[in-house]
């Protein structure tokens, strides 16, 4: 629990530190701790016009509600985004949109679809709140298994490969935050012929003393990685 809380705080701090450099103290205090933080970020230079929709991805365990966004014209490399412990929410939709503006077809997933539809947390709620933790931790435990992650990864890759906006001649990238970090590694190992790049930010549990530690999957991957 402590590790997940730290990761969640790091994700918010990254956005906050960027914002501090762009706004006055009064403006920053008004927007801090809100999805509005992400909305203040400037558009990507030369940003593509994009289109985004809520989609449902069929998996062996049900239907995963996700957000799919991509440039309005043409075919582009696919990207899977795994959110942190607070799940798919407006801030991650905006992050996915910014990535799509750079020329990618982005699927931002609800990792907790087995338990609840997104969003699973109200804007402004903190993981440090015991009531919020009590609500989210069962979702996390239902998701954070190697077998479950592999099942979902294969379903999400298959979804992307079936989209007209995805260039299937190019490999897929995947990125994850906090609890999404280990899922990125498992995704790369589960479909090494399709995953060509991975990035984890504030990833928790990338290396453990368990026999299924994500780092032990490295020999099974064929992807370039950024671990930050």
Q: Which residues does each predicted region cover?
A:
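N-terminal twin-arginine translocation
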Residues: 20-30, 37-49
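Short amphipathic alpha-helix adjacent to the substrate-entry channel of hydrolases
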Residues: 90-109, 113-114
């Amino acid at each position: 629990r402590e590790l997940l809380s730290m990761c969640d705080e790091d994700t918010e701090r990254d956005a906050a530190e960027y914002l501090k450099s762009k706004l006055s103290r009064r403006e920053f205090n008004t927007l801090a701790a809100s999805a509005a933080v992400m909305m203040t970020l400037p558009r990507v230079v030369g940003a593509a016009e994009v289109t985004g929709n809520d989609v449902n991805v069929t998996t062996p365990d049900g239907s995963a509600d996700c957000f799919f966004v991509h440039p309005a014209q043409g075919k582009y490399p696919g990207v899977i985004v795994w959110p942190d412990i607070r799940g798919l929410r407006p801030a991650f939709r905006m992050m996915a949109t910014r990535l799509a503006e750079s020329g990618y077809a982005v699927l931002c997933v609800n990792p907790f679809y087995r338990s609840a539809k997104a969003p699973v947390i109200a804007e402004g709620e903190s993981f440090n709140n015991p009531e919020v933790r009590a609500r989210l931790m069962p979702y996390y435990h239902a998701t954070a298994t190697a077998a479950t992650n592999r099942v979902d990864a294969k379903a999400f890759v298959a979804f992307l490969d079936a989209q007209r906006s995805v260039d299937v001649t190019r490999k897929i990238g995947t990125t994850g935050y906090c609890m999404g970090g280990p899922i990125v590694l498992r995704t790369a190992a589960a479909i090494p012929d399709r995953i060509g790049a991975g990035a984890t930010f504030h990833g928790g549990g990338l290396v453990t003393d368990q026999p299924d530690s994500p780092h032990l999957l490295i020999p099974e991957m064929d992807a370039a990685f950024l671990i930050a």
